[in-house]
C-alpha cells in the first residue's frame, strides 16, 4: 500500500509540555483521511511540523518521499502540497482577482479550468478587496487558491470553518472530486458529520497521542454498544476482554463500548446468566466521545 505521508515517533515539546507524543501516522495515496481531536489535542502543531513550519523535538516524517525535518526538503514539500491553514491568512490589500493572478504565477501546474469552475460555484467577487470579504468568503477564497494549484496532496486545517450549510456541502463535494481525480486529502475538522460524510480513514489524537487509526468503514462495522441485563451481583462480572473499551454499570444493567470481538462479549454475558443482551451500532460522534473518555 503506497503512502503519501508517514511519521515515526513524531513529537513536539514546549518546555515541559509535550504537545505531540510519538505519533506514527500513515496516509494512503488517493484517500480522504480525517484528522480528529479536541481543541488542544495537537492537530495544528502536527500539521505545522509536517509542512516544515515547526521543527519536531523528536521523531521524523516524510511527505511525498521528502523529509519534513530537512530545511531544503521541507521547502519542496510546501511547493508540492496545497495547504489551507486554520486562520485562512490572505493579503488583505489585494482584490480577489489580484491574489488569483499572484498565486498562479508560482505554480506551473495551475488548473485554470478548476479556477474558473470554482469561481462560478463559490460565487467569489473578483473585484472585491480581500479585507472586505466575510469570514465565509475568505474561507472560500483560501480553498480555491489551494484547490486550483493542481497538487496531488492537500492538507486542510478546518476547511469548512465559517461556511454556511450550502457552501459547506459544495466544498465537501469538491473534496470528494479531488480524490476521485487521484489526489489525496488530509484534513482536520471538528464537524464529525462532515467527516463521516466524506472520509475513508480516521486518525484521532488525544493529548498529543494517537488513539485511533482505522478505515472509517471498519470503525462503523465493528464498534458497538453491548447492553446486558444481569441479575447476579454485577460487581462480580468480569468483562475484561479484548475489544471492550469501556464498561458502565447501572443497577443490573451493564453497558459496554466494544471496538471489536462483539461475539465473545455476548458469550461472556450469557455465561453470567444475562437475561437479555442487546447490541446497537454507534455513530462516529459517539465513538469519538468514548475514545476520548477511554484515553483519559
Each predicted region: which residue ranges?
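Short, charged/small-residue-rich alpha-helical element at the C-terminal edge
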Residues: 225-296
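ABC transporter nucleotide-binding domain
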Residues: 170-257
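Walker A (P-loop) phosphate-binding loop of ABC-type ATPase nucleotide-binding domains
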Residues: 37-42
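Helix-to-loop junction immediately C-terminal to a conserved catalytic motif
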Residues: 51
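Conserved ABC transporter NBD signature motif
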Residues: 59-70, 76-77
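ABC-family P-loop ATPase nucleotide-binding domains
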Residues: 79, 85-142
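Catalytic Walker B motif of ABC-type/P-loop ATPase nucleotide-binding domains
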Residues: 154-158, 163
Amino acid at each position: 500500500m503506497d503512502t503519501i505521508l508517514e511519521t515515526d515517533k513524531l513529537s513536539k515539546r514546549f518546555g515541559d509540555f509535550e504537545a505531540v507524543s510519538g505519533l506514527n501516522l500513515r496516509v494512503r495515496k488517493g484517500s480522504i483521511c480525517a484528522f480528529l481531536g479536541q481543541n488542544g489535542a495537537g492537530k495544528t502543531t502536527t500539521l505545522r511540523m509536517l509542512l516544515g513550519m515547526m521543527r519536531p523535538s523528536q521523531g521524523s516524517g516524510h511527505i511525498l518521499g521528502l523529509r519534513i525535518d530537512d530545511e531544503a526538503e521541507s521547502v519542496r514539500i510546501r511547493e508540492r502540497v496545497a495547504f489551507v491553514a486554520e486562520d485562512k491568512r490572505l493579503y488583505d490589500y489585494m482584490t480577489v482577482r489580484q491574489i488569483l493572478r499572484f498565486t498562479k504565477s508560482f505554480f506551473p501546474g495551475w488548473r485554470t479550468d478548476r479556477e474558473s469552475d470554482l469561481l462560478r460555484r463559490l460565487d467569489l467577487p473578483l473585484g472585491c478587496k480581500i479585507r472586505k470579504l466575510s469570514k465565509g468568503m475568505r474561507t472560500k477564497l483560501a480553498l480555491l487558491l489551494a484547490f486550483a494549484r493542481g497538487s496531488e496532496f492537500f492538507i486542510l486545517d478546518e476547511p469548512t470553518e465559517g461556511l454556511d450549510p450550502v457552501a459547506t456541502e459544495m466544498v465537501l463535494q469538491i473534496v470528494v472530486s479531488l480524490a476521485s481525480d487521484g489526489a489525496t486529502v488530509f484534513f482536520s475538522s471538528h464537524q464529525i458529520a462532515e467527516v463521516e460524510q466524506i472520509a475513508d480513514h480516521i486518525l484521532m489524537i488525544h493529548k498529543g497521542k494517537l488513539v485511533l487509526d482505522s478505515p472509517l468503514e471498519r470503525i462503523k462495522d465493528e464498534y458497538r454498544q453491548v447492553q446486558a441485563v444481569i441479575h447476579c451481583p454485577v460487581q462480580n462480572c468480569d468483562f475484561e476482554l479484548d475489544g471492550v473499551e469501556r464498561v458502565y454499570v447501572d443497577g443490573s444493567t451493564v453497558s459496554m463500548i466494544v471496538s471489536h470481538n462483539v461475539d465473545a462479549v455476548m458469550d461472556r454475558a450469557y455465561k453470567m446468566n444475562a437475561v437479555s443482551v442487546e447490541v446497537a451500532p454507534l455513530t462516529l460522534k459517539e465513538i469519538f466521545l468514548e475514545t476520548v473518555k477511554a484515553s483519559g
